[in-house]
Each structure stands twice: as C-alpha cells, then as structure tokens.
C-alpha cells in the first residue's frame, strides 16, 4: 500500500507547549526554552496499524497571534490537536471558540480532533482537573482526550496516532475501484 499523507494542525494558546509536543514527537527531544512560534512545519514517517503514514504537522502561533492565517491552516488541515496547559485556566477556556472556528471553516461537524491537557508533569501547579478535560471532550462530542507531558514523553505518540486513526476512519483508503463499463446492449 502506498504511503498516505496526513495534514495535522496543532492549535492552542501561546505557551501551552504546542512546539514542545511536536518536537518531542518528531525529533524525540524536549525543547526547554520558550521561543514563540510564528509557524513551523515538520514531516515524520510513522507506521500506524501496519500502514505507512507521512505526517505533515503544522505547529502554529498561539491563538492570540496571527489570526488571519488561522482560517487557512484550518481549511487545509485534516486533523487537529487542540492543546491547553493544565496550569492555566485561560488556555483551557479558549478551546471551545477555537473548536467552533474549526467546524465553521471546515463546514463540517465531524472533524478529527484530539484534546490535549499538556504539562501533566506539573501536577503541583495544576488548576485544570483531568475531569474538567474529560467533560470538555464530552461537550465536544466525545472528542478523544488525554493529558500529556512533552518533557517526560507522556502520551505524546498517542496524540498523533489517535488522530491518524480518526482520519482513517473518516476517509478510509480501500483498493482502487474498477471502472464500470458504460456499455449498453440494445
């Protein structure tokens, strides 16, 4: 089976760890220094459910920046990672509007999405409970939810692998259909 390409967009407020999660997944390293992203694109080939996949991951600026570019990201993306920080209420509270914007741009209710509560290694600074994340995921229509830590490599691969599975379920790839004959007997 040929290599299938996936366009994944990572969205959320500035400082939630979008770049850290993406770089941890793609390169296997944790970026300690915070350097605000304008836009970075990464490619990684992975195997999911015995299928070779080429991921193009767009790591975006925080939601408070470059809003004009966001509609374009959303239009082209096949799946979305919505990230908040478990140590910040405001990053969590922005996600319902972000999800609504994705649904509006895609003009679809069934968009592959993963909700991620990042920085779960900072449990002593936690202000958003796991239950709050689970409840938001339910409100999003049983969106896949998990907590992650880019620093400690917790659930990082699962974010992207689950998203690939969702995209595959929505757009399955089967064997090419044979062209039907357009011949008619009279």
Curated annotation (Swiss-Prot):
SMART domains: RAB, RAN, RAS, RHO. G protein of the Ras family that positively regulates phagocytosis and negatively regulates macropinocytosis. May be involved in the activation of guanylyl cyclase during the response to hyperosmotic conditions. Overexpressing cells generate alterations in cell shape and contractile responses. Involved in chemotaxis via regulation of the balance of Ras and Rap signaling at the leading edge of chemotaxing cells. NCBIfam families: small_GTP. SUPFAM superfamilies: P-loop containing nucleoside triphosphate hydrolases (SSF52540). Belongs to the small GTPase superfamily. Ras family. It is an enzyme of class 3 (hydrolase). PROSITE patterns: RAS. Its main location: membrane. One of its GO terms (cellular component) is cell cortex. A lipid is attached at residue 183 (S-geranylgeranyl cysteine). It comes from the Eukaryota. The keyword Magnesium does not apply. Its EC number is 3.6.5.2. The gene is rapA. Coiled coil: none annotated. This is Ras-related protein rapA. The keyword Cell membrane applies. Gene3D superfamilies: P-loop containing nucleotide triphosphate hydrolases (3.40.50.300). It holds the Pfam family Ras. GO terms for molecular function: G protein activity; GDP binding; GTP binding; GTPase activator activity; GTPase activity; guanylate cyclase activator activity; small GTPase binding. It catalyses: GTP + H2O = GDP + phosphate + H(+). It is found in: Cell membrane. Transmembrane segments: none annotated. Keywords: Cell membrane, GTP-binding, Hydrolase, Lipoprotein, Membrane, Methylation, Nucleotide-binding, Prenylation. GTP binds at residues 12-19, 59-63, 118-121. A motif (Effector region) lies at residues 34-42.
